[in-house]
Amino acid sequence: MNPFPGLRPFLFDDSHLFFGRDTQITELASRLRKNRFLAVVGTSGSGKSSLVRAGLLPELLSGTMASAGSSWESATMRPGGDPLTNLARSLVEAGLYDQDEPEIISQVRATLTRSGLGLLEAVRQSDKEKKSNLLLVVDQFEEIFRFRNSEDATDEQAAFFVNLLLEATAQSDLPIYIIITMRSDFLGDCSRFPRLADTVNEGEFLIPRLNRDQRKAAITGPVQVAGGQIADRLLSRLLNDIGDDPDQLPILQHALMRDGNRGIPRHGKMHRDRRGRRADLHRHAMIFHQKGDLLGQIGP
């Protein structure tokens, strides 16, 4: 088993491989108790999506928010080129409705567009257990700003989508929680929508850099889950090579995934000479830079 996902984010089913973020998970859950709208903000590849999907979601299902219980439904979406359809699709694919067919998605979309309370109405009409909470994750929220500037969009469409989210978390009748993940360089764009900047400011969670011990756990934890070990000398060199630069974390994850594809020795140790490891990291970094903003497009 290869315990490293590479460039893609950690998903819910990868939670047993997600290490080094315990403090952040606890803090995020604590903030969600006080604010139903959270904005997880950070640079490309800083682990925003992974923190929510593989960290927070399993934590919520464990009952960590006693006031909300442990019954949760979750839907994940990206705005893309049609935010309203993608929102409707995410609700249907999350199993909130007994049927999972194209016409159901169209019906849910129609409900969403009836009024500013469309998301509330869509949830009321769903087959979700009445006492269960709904967590909607809007990943790569910055896509809404690109959508607003596209030829196929209007200011009204983008603003309507944003307003649906804000209205859903401003009420207390239904237990709806929303988390957006967004690149930090788009924070200023939030002022383009009424109330969004203030709401983001109130619920902002800025992804901190991992310290050395946390980076160590992120490397050794998955290896140990896979039944292997990593040589102390190699571990020290890896930690020294990536340093405090968050841009190196996705590159390291990709390099470790490549090593994992070659096989992690059970009850043995991963070894690599310093020159070889540095060459690996440098080669992967060059590939990413040659492909442009790859990390910004698909990084975790």
What are these regions (language model features)?
Residues M1-R283:
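Amphipathic helix/helix-loop-helix segment enriched in hydrophobic residues with interspersed Lys/Arg
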Residues F288-G299:
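Hydrophobic, low-acid, alpha-helix-prone terminal segments
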